[in-house]
């Protein structure tokens, strides 16, 4: 990833926020996101910093050692695309072994440089469902059937 000083300030702020995200830092979400920000990922679609904060609170409750690593960031003061990996452990998934989800986020910024739209793109079937004991076998079977 380019050095943070080469990126537009809103991008640098959001990258720093995600790479240092913790239960304790969730209180800073309003510094990075607009009050009426829209957030969408494969499981959630919400508006506002309160609901966005609750998504991350649930993440910290359900997962062990969740951490984002931004691999690439491109954009300007109005929009950005981040390519990232998300590392975590879940005692109910694959015996609690480390897991990784690869994805990308599309961000749009308001006039104050805060995130007004955050859209995550990642393959829930490949990155998550295929790792679940019963569902995983079915997903892999379906994938093979569709591929031929």
Briefly describe each language-model feature range.
Residues 14, 18, 33, 56, ...:
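Hydrophobic alpha-helical core bundles mediating ligand binding, dimerization, or RNAP-core interactions
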Residues 9, 13, 51, 99:
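Soluble or luminal CAZymes and related metallo-dependent hydrolases
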Residues 16, 20, 38-39, 91:
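General structural signal for alpha-helix termini and helix-helix connectors
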Residues 26-80:
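A solvent-exposed, acidic/Ser-Thr-rich amphipathic alpha-helical stretch
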Residues 13-16, 31, 54, 58-61, ...:
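Charged/polar, solvent-exposed surface patches and flexible loops
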Residues 1-27, 31, 145-148:
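Short, low-complexity N-terminal intrinsically disordered segments enriched in polar/charged residues
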Residues 61-67, 71-148:
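A beta-strand edge to alpha-helix "cap/lid" segment located at domain peripheries
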């Amino acid at each position: 990833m380019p050095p943070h000083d080469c990126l537009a300030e809103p991008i640098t702020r959001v990258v720093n926020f995600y790479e240092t995200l913790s239960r304790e830092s969730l209180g800073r979400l309003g510094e990075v996101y607009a009050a009426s920000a829209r957030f969408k990922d494969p499981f959630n679609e919400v508006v506002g910093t309160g609901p966005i904060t609750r998504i991350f609170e649930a993440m910290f409750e359900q997962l062990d050692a969740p951490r984002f690593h931004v691999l690439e960031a491109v954009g300007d003061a109005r929009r950005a695309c981040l390519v990232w990996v998300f590392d975590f452990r879940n005692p109910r998934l694959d015996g609690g072994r480390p897991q990784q989800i690869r994805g990308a986020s599309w961000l749009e910024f308001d006039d104050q440089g805060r995130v007004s739209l955050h859209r995550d793109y990642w393959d829930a079937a490949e990155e998550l469902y295929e790792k679940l004991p019963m569902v995983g076998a079915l997903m892999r079977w379906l994938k093979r059937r569709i591929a031929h």
